[in-house]
Amino acid sequence: MTIAKGCTNCEAERDTIAQGFHEMLKVLKQAKGQTEVQAKAALYDIINDKSLSDDERWTQMRPFNDLLSEQEESDIRIRRTILIGLFSFWELSLKYICAYYKLDVAGMKGIKLKKESQLKNDRILFSENDYLKAIFHSERPNIVDVISSKIKELRNYMTHGSADKNRQAVIDSIISEYPDFFVKKTHDGYYITSYDGLDNILKIINDGLIIAETTAKTLNVQIN
């Protein structure tokens, strides 16, 4: 991957990680497609083989049906893990942006530091919301709210496997408002049903980070 000249360290790192996620999703989607095509082709041949008895047909079909079932279960786990990774990419990138542009995260949180080293020595932990407050102060773009509320709640569900009424309402709103995320509700929970959905979430997160860094640059210029 080629990094454009003139990029900041934040931009270069973001572009590298985003491209890596995109390429990984592409490979996973292709692998899934190839497995399904081969298994379904084998099933088609078995189903249409008139020389087989019903018992023989069932016996020969079973390993391919099992393969498809195992493939889908594996894909569900992989998609869940990737979503968690995508949100971590968002959180850590916000932290890096604040550090790179020397934004006063502690001050926005109401913490007064006597020395710059105090932040490191006291190991003060900041949240995603703290970094967002340091970048956007009071008003946040809609795309940032989508990430920090809706996608965050979906990540929380994928991490913990549980959802109270509020979280369910948020995820249900994702299903209705963002069909390109490919989130599906079944009797036993919520699932991301396509790698394309994760690629679309990646694009939203990447766009949000571009806006965050652009805003941080402006703040940095104003401060200096």
Predicted regions: what is each one?
Residues 1-84, 92-94, 142-149, 169-224:
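Extended intrinsically disordered or low-complexity regions, especially N/C-terminal cytosolic tails and loops
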Residues 84, 92-191, 195:
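Flexible secondary-structure boundary motifs
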